[in-house]
Every structure is written in C-alpha cells, then in structure tokens.
C-alpha cells in the first residue's frame, strides 16, 4: 500500500449494549495517538489497563489498551484496540475522540481490505472473514473457517503452480519451431494437462458444494389460489408466517421465509396467486411474485388432486420459465387419496403432502436437497461463492480448449493455459479488477 494511507477507526463490536465494546484503529505510527488517548505508551501485544480521556483530560471510560505493531497485526499496519464498556454512548464518545486525533471513520470492510492489500490475507481468505461472520448454520461456520485459514486458497495456489510449470514447459518449446516434432507429446504436455483438468474438476466440485451451503436454494410456491401454498410455507417454517384462510387471494404479497435443511439455507417465497386482478395492491404483490419466480431455482407446484390441472393452474404453469425445475405437490393428502402419477406439470418428482399432519414433509426436504445438488458435508469442503464457481468453470473451459489444440498449435495451447491461470488468480485476488474489490469489501460490516 502507499505510504500516504490515512488512519482509520471504527467500532468493531456489534451495535447495541453489551458488557464489552471495542474500538479498532489502524494506520501508521499510532503510538502518539495512544499517548494522547490514554497517557501511556503501550508495549506491543501486552494488555494495558488505562483511562481513555477526552481533549481536556477527562475520563470517557476505562478499560484495556492493546497495541499491535506493524507488520505483525491483522491489517499489517499499526493497530490499536480500545476495549471498554459496551454502551452505545460510550462507544460513540470514544470513536469521536479517535476522529479528533486524526483518524477517519473506516468504510465497511476497510480493515480486511487493508489486510488483503498488505498481503496478510488473499481475497478468498478475506471473503472467508465475512462468511464466518454471516454464517447461518454450524456447517457454514465450519467451512467458512476453513476458507479463512487458507484451505481453499491452498487448493487454488496448487492449481496455479501446476499451470505455471506447464506453461514454462510449453513456452520453452516455442524456441524450436521445427514442424516435424510434436513437442506437446514429447514433453508429455497433454498428460500433464489431463492431470490439471482432473484437479480443476475436483476443486470445482468442492466449490459448488460450498456455494450451495453459502448461497442456498431459492424456492417458489406456485399454484391456484387457496390450494394450500401458505399452509405449506408455515409447515416448512414451523411457524405461522403466512395467513391461512378459505378465502382465495388472502396472500396479496409475496411472503418470504428462510429455513435450514441439513444446514443448507432454503429461501422460500409464497407467491401471491399468479392471476389477473383489478385490485391495485394485489397486483403489486403479483408482480413481486413474478420477479421471485424469475430468480428461483425450484418451483413447488401445488395441485389439488380432486381438481387436477384446472384453468388457473395451467395459466400459472404457462408463466413459469421452461427451464425452471419443478416438484409437483399433491396438497391436502389428509383429506383425500393421493392420485397416481402426476398431472403433466413438467415435474420429474411428485409428492403427496399434508401440511396439517406433516406427512410428506421429510420427503419434500430430501428432494429439495437433491435438487440443490447437496451431497452432505465431507472432508475437503470449504465455503465458496458464485464468483469462485464461475472462475473455476472459466478455467475448466480454457483447459478443455487447450486439449482440443492440434499438435503444432503450441502458441494457442499456451494462451489457453495463461487464461486458465488468470481465471484461478481472480479467486485469490492475484488478477482482480479494483471495482470488484470495491463490491466485495463494501458488503462487510463496519469495523471488520
């Protein structure tokens, strides 16, 4: 980083009242600030009890002062932490005192961004920090910690090293352009490429599992009005999150709920019945439902077996994207016998279900996990993001194109290897545009 880097400060603990609150400060040459704040010059990595004072020397609070000298700190800069009492007024007064002494308020994720720019973390590890904080299940927390500790990064660095080795081998042959020699075969470049492709496939498979655990599955409930969508949402959520009546059109807006199935987040939207209406409020809800459908991974199509595919249900099915996965749900199975087979909804799976008794719920949950592609938490998994999966797919594609190169297309072969390396480097931040960094770190909380 540049030498002309401002000192930043922020409250590092969650908003609200608590037993302890922490102010984090990062910058260069922070000992004078510590002296002004506490009247003491702290020793590195030693907790010092002190009064935190204002400009007039009046005590604001008292607590622990910790100093981490550069480069042995989280950000790679001098870092001070003030651990005081966790009241919002006290934290605000302490933070304002830091700003008076020359710090500026940190932007979201700026501490972690500085750690990345100072080579304390790579980009995948930095994202692991945010994912650990945002983890919605124990499985997600465990896998995020693996990413933070560098498990994912080490896999990527291994791929990059193998790519560099193969590139050096192939590019060295460009100095010998004799047409009667197959350098790709002579150097076993194709054999090494096959090994690389298998390694990328393995990392990609793990990343896809990690992305499922982080991103989850988007599910919409669709069906004719009063077919039982809200009852099913309540049954899945284990709570009364949607109003249930016998009146068609009770759900006038899309109702959203998030549940966990085997640690995998499932985002469920109970759509307002997709139909034409003169009601202005209901029409807005229906438009929101259509948007939810366009973003869904799976549609649960509820059908009353006594009625089958009536005109309203057919109209709803016609409005669904043709590529959207569908699971056909025969609702209210406690009231009538399950119809054999499906009703031609385009679903590969048909489940008879009673939201009232719970029959069929476990089968539905298992089916949702299968549709998500979740294979269960195993060894070697790490939390990943969609951008990681896309980068690995790009690398996979470049290696596939390299495999198609003819025996004497060495320059093209080498170029595909280079592009595969660039794709892998985007994951760890070796090749990453500044605007992408801005997006990634802006989603962190302030103080991290």
From Swiss-Prot:
NCBIfam families: mnmE_trmE_thdF, PRK05291.1-3, small_GTP. GTP binds at residues 226-231, 245-251, 270-273. Residues 216-373 form the TrmE-type G domain. Exhibits a very high intrinsic GTPase hydrolysis rate. Involved in the addition of a carboxymethylaminomethyl (cmnm) group at the wobble position (U34) of certain tRNAs, forming tRNA-cmnm(5)s(2)U34. GO terms for biological process: tRNA methylation; tRNA wobble uridine modification. Binds 1 potassium ion per subunit. This is tRNA modification GTPase MnmE. Homodimer. Heterotetramer of two MnmE and two MnmG subunits. (6S)-5-formyl-5,6,7,8-tetrahydrofolate binds at residues 24, 81, 120, 448. It is found in: Cytoplasm. InterPro entries: G_TrmE (IPR031168), GTP-bd (IPR006073), GTP-bd_TrmE_N (IPR018948), GTPase_MnmE (IPR004520), MnmE_dom2 (IPR027368), MnmE_helical (IPR025867), P-loop_NTPase (IPR027417), Small_GTP-bd (IPR005225). Mg(2+) binds at residues 230, 251. It comes from Neisseria meningitidis serogroup C (strain 053442). Its cofactor is K(+). Its EC number is 3.6.-.-. It holds the Pfam family TrmE_N. It comes from the Bacteria.
């Amino acid at each position: 980083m540049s030498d002309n880097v401002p000192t930043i400060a922020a409250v590092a603990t969650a908003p609200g009242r608590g037993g302890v609150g922490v102010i984090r400060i990062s910058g260069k040459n922070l000992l004078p600030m510590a002296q002004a704040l506490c009247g003491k010059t702290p020793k590195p990595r030693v907790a010092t009890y002190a009064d935190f004072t204002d400009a007039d020397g009046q005590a604001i609070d008292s607590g622990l002062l910790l100093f981490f000298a550069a480069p042995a700190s989280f950000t790679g800069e001098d870092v001070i932490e003030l651990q005081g009492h966790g009241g919002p007024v006290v934290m605000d007064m302490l933070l304002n005192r830091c700003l008076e002494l020359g710090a500026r308020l940190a932007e979201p994720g700026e501490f972690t961004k500085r750690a990345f720019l100072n080579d304390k973390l790579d980009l995948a590890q930095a994202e692991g920090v945010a994912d650990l904080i945002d983890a919605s299940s124990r499985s997600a927390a465990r896998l995020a910690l693996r990413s933070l500790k560098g498990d994912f990064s080490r896999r990527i660095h291994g791929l990059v090293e193998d790519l560099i080795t193969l590139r050096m081998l192939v590019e060295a042959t460009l100095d010998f352009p004799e047409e009667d020699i197959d350098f790709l075969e002579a150097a076993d470049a194709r054999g090494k490429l096959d090994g690389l492709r298998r390694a990328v496939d393995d990392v990609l498979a793990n990343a896809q599992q990690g992305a499922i655990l982080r991103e989850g599955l988007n599910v919409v409930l669709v069906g004719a009005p009063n077919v039982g969508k809200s009852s099913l949402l309540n049954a899945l959520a284990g709570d009364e999150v949607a109003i249930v009546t016998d009146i068609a059109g009770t759900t006038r807006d899309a109702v959203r709920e998030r549940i966990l199935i085997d640690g995998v987040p499932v985002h469920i939207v109970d759509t307002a019945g997709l139909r034409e209406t003169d009601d202005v409020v209901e029409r807005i809800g229906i438009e929101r439902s259509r948007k939810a459908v366009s973003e869904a991974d799976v549609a649960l199509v509820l059908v009353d077996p006594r009625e089958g595919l009536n005109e309203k249900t057919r109209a709803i099915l016609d409005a669904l994207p043709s590529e959207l996965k569908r699971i056909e749900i025969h609702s209210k199975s406690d009231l009538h016998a399950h119809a054999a087979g499906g009703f031609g909804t385009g679903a590969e799976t048909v489940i008879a279900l009673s939201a009232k008794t719970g029959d069929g719920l476990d089968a539905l949950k298992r089916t949702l996990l299968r549709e998500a592609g979740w294979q269960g938490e195993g060894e070697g998994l790490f939390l990943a993001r969609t951008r990681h999966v896309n980068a690995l797919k790009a690398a996979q594609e470049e290696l596939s194109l390299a495999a198609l190169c003819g025996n004497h297309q060495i320059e093209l072969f080498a170029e595909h290897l280079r592009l595969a390396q660039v794709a892998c480097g985007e994951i760890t931040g070796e090749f990453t545009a500044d605007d992408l960094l801005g997006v990634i770190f802006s989603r962190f909380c302030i103080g991290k």
